[in-house]
Amino acid sequence: MSDIKTYNEETQELFLRFLLSDPDLFARCQNIVEPEYFNLKYRPAVELFKSHSEKHNAIPTPEQVSAVAGTVLEPIPNVTVDHHDWFLSEFETFCRHKALE
């Protein structure tokens, strides 16, 4: 099995939906989130996440992301601790991979 993963648009959108769904997850990841790690389509949303959290100490609402960044993201309902664990592991790997590109 290969250690190299591909992160398609669906995966990147899923990561953003997780971040939108749980402010605590975003707080834990905000120092490694960089817009350039994402496809061009999602960069305005990531920039908004970062700037909004710095200015307002909160993540933007789905409506704000849609209006300001032009990206429609739906929160993920019923996120569990197991989902958090998966997300944190996968997102850290994603950020490391993208930082080396």
Briefly describe each language-model feature range.
Residues M1-C95:
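Noncatalytic partner-interaction/assembly domains of nucleic-acid and motor enzyme complexes
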